[in-house]
């Protein structure tokens, strides 16, 4: 997680290595406003909070070193509770009311997918979304800057490793939304390359803490 946060922030700083003028939305003579929409409450809150804390720590270090061209970085975080409808509201608030210059560190496939139309309409960059879904990589989106591997790559490596251990009966326990289905797709593709099928598939609802029930 620390490495991912460092990469995300480094990409953001790369954006600011270019000349930034006060006339830009989210940029004043003294600060640059950056927005984050993520789960800060609910079962997935630890992911959102850790990203938020890491970004804040990195921003503090940059600001202590005179910021970006004399401007301090300010993070504005909006809670989406890991729910798509709330993510849409959060990102629109960041864009329309908070007037941020860029977005950073969203958490989750369903929430990021839901926010993409508003991101594209505003032409605002989203740096380091915490998701590996192929739907956010293909077709190419000039507003999205990824720093992590795709779920297809990750699941291929998982199945590859299990195969080296002689394990061929592989079941998939996945979240019943775009995030879980992206992971399922990756496993199915990886198994198909080895002439295998999932031994079983079981789903759990997003934000549910009852994982024992579906497995019973």
Region roles according to the model:
Residues 22-36, 67-72, 163-168:
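Immediate post-signal peptide segment of exported/extracytoplasmic ligand-binding proteins
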Residues 31-33, 46-53, 61, 65-135, ...:
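Beta-alpha junction/loop-to-helix N-cap segments that form part of ligand/metal-binding clefts
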Residues 38-44:
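Short glycine-rich His-centered loop
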Residues 1-33:
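Short, low-complexity disordered leader/linker segments with a strong preference
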Residues 89, 134-135, 142-216:
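Extracellular/periplasmic Venus flytrap/periplasmic-binding protein
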Residues 39, 80, 175:
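Cofactor-binding loop segments of dinucleotide-utilizing enzymes, especially the Rossmann-like FAD-
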């Amino acid at each position: 997680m620390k490495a991912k946060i460092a990469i995300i922030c480094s990409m953001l700083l790369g954006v600011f290595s270019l000349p930034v003028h006060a006339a830009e939305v989210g940029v004043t003579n003294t600060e640059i406003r950056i927005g984050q929409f993520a789960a800060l409450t609910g079962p997935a809150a630890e992911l959102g909070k850790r990203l938020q804390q890491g970004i804040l720590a990195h921003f503090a270090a940059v600001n202590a070193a005179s910021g970006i061209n004399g401007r301090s970085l300010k993070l504005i975080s909006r809670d989406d509770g890991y729910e798509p409808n709330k993510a849409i509201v959060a990102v629109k608030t960041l864009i329309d009311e908070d007037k941020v210059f860029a977005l950073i560190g969203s958490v989750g496939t369903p929430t990021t997918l839901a926010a993409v139309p508003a991101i594209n309409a505003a032409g605002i960059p989203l740096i380091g979304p915490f998701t590996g879904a192929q739907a956010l990589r293909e077709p190419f989106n000039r507003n999205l800057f990824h720093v992590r591997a795709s779920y297809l790559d990750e699941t291929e490596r998982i199945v590859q490793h299990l195969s080296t251990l002689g394990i061929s009966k592989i079941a998939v326990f996945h979240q019943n939304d775009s995030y879980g289905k992206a992971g399922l797709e990756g496993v199915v593709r990886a198994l198909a390359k080895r002439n295998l099928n999932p031994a079983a598939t079981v789903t759990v609802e997003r934000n549910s803490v009852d994982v024992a029930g579906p497995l019973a």
